[in-house]
Amino acid sequence: MQSKRPIIIGIAGGSGSGKTTIAHEIYDQLQQDDHILIMTQDSYYKNNDNLSMADRKKINYDHPDAFDMPLLVEQLRQLMDYKAVEMPVYDFTAHTRSEKTIHTEPADIIILEGILVLGEENLRDLMSIKVFVDTDDDIRFIRRLERDTQERGRSVESVINQYLATVKPMYNQFIEPTKRYADIIVPEGGENDVAIDMLTTKIRSVLSTVK
């Protein structure tokens, strides 16, 4: 029976804001002292294998309904109980969940990053520290364009069309408003070394109270 529970750090912000960079900066600074797990909300998009490819491409991936939040909460709670989980893998080329899973062991620090990780109360309630990464719209778009064309096999035109049709409106409607739930707001994303250092100091402080 474990006498303590992992601490959960939620990192939210728009696509391309620097969430992943910050998560890995924290990992690099703390990994020598603690076992750390990074989880991404992108892994928990709903399984769309019942839809045609044409219909999958029409899905609004920046809307809260695109995510399998019950599964995310369930697996996060299992990890908090120090139980391993089979984490889903999302295939961004096929626009659906892969048949593969990743066997994931629990850790003392769990960093959960994603556009809407602060959007649901039952998920926020599991977090010890809530972070919102606030980055200029133009910078976020350029980063998303580079990522989706280089890593996800997208065309420039499709990325631009998606940004104008869903990404920007969904950011304004659903993502940016979750900033009010954050304990810490990090401007300029992964480029803000001072904020990242302050964040790791805060995490160490929280850790010292549960060890």
UniProtKB/Swiss-Prot annotation:
Q: Specify the pathway.
A: Pyrimidine metabolism; CTP biosynthesis via salvage pathway; CTP from cytidine: step 1/3; Pyrimidine metabolism; UMP biosynthesis via salvage pathway; UMP from uridine: step 1/1
Name the Gene Ontology molecular function terms of this record.
Answer: ATP binding; ATP hydrolysis activity; cytidine kinase activity; uridine kinase activity
* Disulfide cross-links: none
Q: Which GO terms describe its biological process?
A: CTP salvage; UMP salvage
Spans traversing the lipid bilayer = none
What the entry lists under SMART domains is as follows:
AAA
Q: Name one GO cellular component term.
A: cytoplasm
Keyword match Lyase? no
For binding ATP, which residues are annotated in this chain's numbering? Answer: 13-20
Q: Pfam families annotated for this entry?
A: PRK
> InterPro entries given for it?
AAA+_ATPase, P-loop_NTPase, PRK/URK, Uridine_kinase, Uridine_kinase-like
Q: Which reaction does it catalyse?
A: uridine + ATP = UMP + ADP + H(+); cytidine + ATP = CMP + ADP + H(+)
Q: EC number(s)?
A: 2.7.1.48
The subcellular localization recorded is: Cytoplasm
Any idea which UniProt keywords this protein has? ATP-binding, Cytoplasm, Kinase, Nucleotide-binding, Transferase
| Extent of the signal sequence | none
Protein name per its UniProtKB record: Uridine kinase
Q: Which organism is it from?
A: Lactobacillus johnsonii (strain CNCM I-12250 / La1 / NCC 533)
Q: Which gene encodes it?
A: udk
